[in-house]
Amino acid sequence: MAWEHLRVTDTPTWPSILGRLTTGQNLGTGQAAWAMDQIMTGTATPAQIAGFAVAMKLKRPTSAEVTELADVMLKHARRIPTDIIGNETVDIVGTGGDGANTVNLSTMAAIVVAAAGVPVMKHGNRAASSLSGGADTLEALGVRIDLGPEQVAASVAEVGIGFAFANQFHPSYKHASAVRRELGVPTVFNLLGPLTNPARPRAGLIGCAWAELAEVMAGVFASRNSSVLVVHGDDGLDELTTTTTSTIWRVQAGTVERLTFDPAAFGFQRAHLSELVGGDAEYNAAEVRAVLGGAKGAVRDAVVLNAAGALVAHAGLSSDAKWVPAWEAGLARATETIDSGAAEKLLARWVRFTQKL
């Protein structure tokens, strides 16, 4: 129905927007942006926010709608200055919400990638559904997570990695986050964290817990000229998994290509999900120290795989990156970075640097 996609010229209202969503119609250009602006400025009521969040998820959001939501959220965010660090940094983050309560694979992978010499600009938060999110675990390791924009940029410039704690950088999101917590079910807002990194890095390994929405996220990154791998473990993880295959939406030069990825092709043994399960922040911090200290096993394998994925995404910023050679190089670099002690040293340097600020 072509008329559904016509530009809507009427001034948006909540009844008109919720009316479209609850009858399964896509929003007109600018309507999602209007709704998000109402939410971010505190104008929308909790009932309007909840209705919008749930109805949008049930309709299934389009990439155009989610792009508008993310762009408005970034407009209200505290920006990280990129004049020193540029935007050819990489983020490693997932939507969360996979219910698996794994150890913090993306946090460990981020440290490995930074130690391999690729600047990491990580966006993250405390746990929503698991016992310990990336922010909780970094705090337990001694990394200060409450840094402001200039301090985070300095951390990337000096150490090679910075962490943007979502609460610090998206103060206007507080209206939505309270509603999101009360609802307790995934909504369209779950997609926004990985799409609203305040430093706008151009590369990323982005996990999505919902296969049907991963392609929507990939479409947003494609519109930004990013080099990103949006990944969904076929066991449901919002990471590249080692228990089975993963589906990858490879975003490069404005296009999206869907691939099935089998780590066994690169020599990885199949793991059991139980081997990747984490605990509270102290438990997960101990797991980080063990893996960076050289401990072998399923967690290390998953960390190496995800670190390599981020290195592949970053390599994709140059147009001549070939898929299989990039993976082989990424896996070798990630392994060497752990085995040489470089990743362990980088974490110690990061802790020292942030504690001095």
UniProtKB/Swiss-Prot annotation:
Protein name (database record): Anthranilate phosphoribosyltransferase
Amino-acid positions noted as binding anthranilate 2 in the UniProt annotation, renumbered to this chain = R180
- Gene name, Swiss-Prot/TrEMBL: trpD
Q: Which reaction does it catalyse?
A: N-(5-phospho-beta-D-ribosyl)anthranilate + diphosphate = 5-phospho-alpha-D-ribose 1-diphosphate + anthranilate
What GO cellular component term, any one, is given?
A: cytosol
> What is the superkingdom listed in this entry's lineage?
Bacteria
Function (record text): Catalyzes the transfer of the phosphoribosyl group of 5-phosphorylribose-1-pyrophosphate (PRPP) to anthranilate to yield N-(5'-phosphoribosyl)-anthranilate (PRA).
Q: What class of enzyme is it?
A: transferase
- Lineage of the source organism? Bacteria, Bacillati, Actinomycetota, Actinomycetes, Mycobacteriales
What is the originating organism of this protein?
Mycobacterium sp. (strain KMS)
What binding details are noted for the cofactor? Answer: Binds 2 magnesium ions per monomer.
